[in-house]
Amino acid sequence: MCDKPDLSEVEKFDKKKLKKTNTEEKNTLPSKETIEQEKECVKSS
């Protein structure tokens, strides 16, 4: 094995073969209101 990678495959790669995908946000961060509500619930218990 040599230290340099073989770039011939990369040079031949055709971007047109890639499919466009729609990204979906899965794990959204809670809003400030939600965080405050949870903090109050913990304090009151």
Curated annotation (Swiss-Prot):
Region annotation (Disordered) ranges: 19-45
GO MF annotations, alphabetized: actin monomer binding
Stored InterPro entries: Beta-thymosin (IPR001152), Beta-thymosin_sf (IPR038386)
Pfam families found in the cross-reference section: Thymosin
GO cellular component, one term: cytoplasm
SMART domains from the UniProt entry: THY
GO biological process: actin filament organization; regulation of cell migration
Entry keyword set: Actin-binding, Cytoplasm, Cytoskeleton
Similarity comment: Belongs to the thymosin beta family.
PANTHER family the record matches: THYMOSIN BETA (PTHR12021), THYMOSIN BETA-15A-RELATED (PTHR12021:SF11)
Protein name per Swiss-Prot or TrEMBL: Thymosin beta-15A homolog
Organism name: Coturnix japonica
